[in-house]
């Protein structure tokens, strides 16, 4: 038996290395299982549901058969050394030497080599999300009916504990790069407001359920991928509620060529307030107001306002030429990033974050909204988007709709935040924030007529600011 544990260690290493090498098969098995469950929970038409279930079941059976073959191959590897041990046979696996050998071989297989040849991506950067994290995100966010079922279960439990929806909340919106993230971070940090955060992903529709499973301590903050100096950690607030609207929408509003205006019906609005309730149930400060940064919010604002006269919305805007330049720079940055790490685009698509990058799509507020005709590397393209966005914002119901300019917010952050929280009825003793004075240098030609129109709209919004 002297050499048997050595051979068993090597055989176990080979068996578990085979398992590791076939990790994509295990991922496929997990995703196929979720697809079957998602199909069973679907409320689609019976024929569509059966067709989806048939496809998911076929994929699951195929993955199961391959997995069984993998188990047999691995078991054969481990069993082979046992056949040559006189008097013990498979009893070797029950001895301490056998258990230690299998454990050592299995551990080594997941450590050496560090990267398998098929996992290497020449010229590609390592993703911030591990393969296991990516799998978990796909299991949840690609299967909306499972996600909805978990949300409804959590809402029922919240109501059973006496939870009631509150129609007063705050939306922070505007085109990307207008200062919305900075404002959201400061509002949440005050304790008077609560928002969804990165720690809620991927089970973002059932934050209480996910927190019971995964409740990490605050992580050290690092600069976000935008490269704009804003530091984020797993407890940083972020625009995550779009998963709710994509899941609950009666018709898809992310289309091939644009993200289009859409209507929120009464049932969706009621469910949205319930969803805010379960999000607030996880807030560290009781009595906090729900706040969401959502750059898509204006696309559904008219119907939300018809259902609800109590909520407040902030529209942040910025000098049009510097705003267009900032959007163009971020678009170019994210195109390169997403080519290097495709999961970045997948993640942004889940959040309907189409403002820039390879998945960039313009907002379309009405059928007659003109889509940009200039290339995405021109300032004119982004200026067209700016005009469409803020022209629509200025035409919307003024009730509790607050316009805040980026330049004023940067120059007088404390005064702006004080005025806003007074408007929405929150009591906050704000610290004295340092003004932000950095100016962007703009390079590139622009259509003078477009710029003149944009600056006219900018002046109108400046006039709508309070204070």
Predicted region positions:
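PAPS-dependent sulfation machinery
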Residues: 199-291, 360-362
């Amino acid at each position: 038996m002297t050499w048997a544990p050595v051979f068993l260690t090597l055989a176990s290493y080979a068996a578990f290395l085979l398992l590791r090498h076939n990790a994509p098969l295990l991922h496929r098995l997990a995703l196929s299982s979720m697809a079957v469950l998602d199909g069973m929970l679907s409320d689609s038409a019976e024929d569509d549901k059966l067709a989806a279930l048939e496809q998911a079941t076929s994929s699951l059976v195929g993955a199961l058969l391959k997995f069984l073959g993998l188990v047999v191959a691995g078991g054969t590897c481990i069993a082979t050394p046992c056949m040559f041990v006189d008097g013990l046979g498979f009893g070797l696996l029950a001895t301490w030497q056998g258990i230690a050998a299998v454990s050592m071989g299995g551990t080594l297989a997941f450590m050496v080599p560090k990267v398998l040849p098929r996992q290497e991506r020449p010229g590609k950067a390592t993703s911030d999300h591990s393969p296991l994290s990516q799998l978990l995100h796909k299991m949840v966010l690609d299967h909306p009916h499972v996600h909805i079922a978990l949300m409804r279960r959590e809402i029922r439990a919240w109501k059973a504990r006496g939870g009631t929806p509150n129609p007063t909340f705050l939306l922070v919106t505007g085109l990307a790069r207008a200062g919305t993230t900075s404002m959201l971070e400061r509002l949440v940090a005050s304790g008077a407001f609560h928002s969804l955060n990165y720690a809620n992903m991927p089970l973002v529709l059932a934050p209480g359920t996910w927190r019971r499973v995964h409740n990490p301590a605050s992580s050290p903050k690092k600069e976000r991928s935008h490269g704009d100096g804003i530091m984020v950690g797993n407890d940083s607030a972020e625009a995550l509620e779009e998963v709710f609207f994509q899941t609950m929408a009666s018709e898809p509003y992310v289309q091939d060529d644009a993200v289009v205006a859409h209507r929120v019906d009464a049932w969706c609005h009621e469910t949205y307030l319930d969803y805010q309730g379960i999000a607030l149930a996880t807030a560290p400060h009781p009595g906090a107001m729900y706040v969401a940064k959502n750059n898509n919010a204006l696309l559904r604002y008219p119907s939300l306002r018809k259902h609800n006269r109590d909520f407040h919305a902030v529209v942040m805007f910025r000098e049009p030429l510097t705003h267009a330049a900032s959007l163009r720079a971020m678009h170019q940055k994210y195109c390169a990033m997403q080519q290097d790490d495709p999961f970045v685009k997948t993640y942004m698509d889940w959040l309907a974050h189409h403002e820039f990058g390879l998945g960039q799509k313009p907002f379309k507020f009405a059928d007659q909204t003109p889509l940009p005709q200039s290339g995405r590397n021109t300032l004119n393209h982004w200026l067209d988007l700016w005009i469409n966005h803020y022209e629509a914002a200025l035409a919307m119901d003024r009730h509790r709709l607050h316009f805040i300019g980026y330049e004023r917010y940067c120059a007088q952050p404390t005064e702006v935040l004080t005025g806003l929280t007074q408007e929405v009825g929150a009591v906050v003793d704000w610290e004295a924030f340092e003004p932000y004075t950095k100016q962007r240098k703009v390079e590139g030609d622009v259509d003078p007529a477009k710029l003149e129109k944009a600056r006219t709209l900018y002046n109108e919004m400046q006039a709508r600011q309070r204070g």
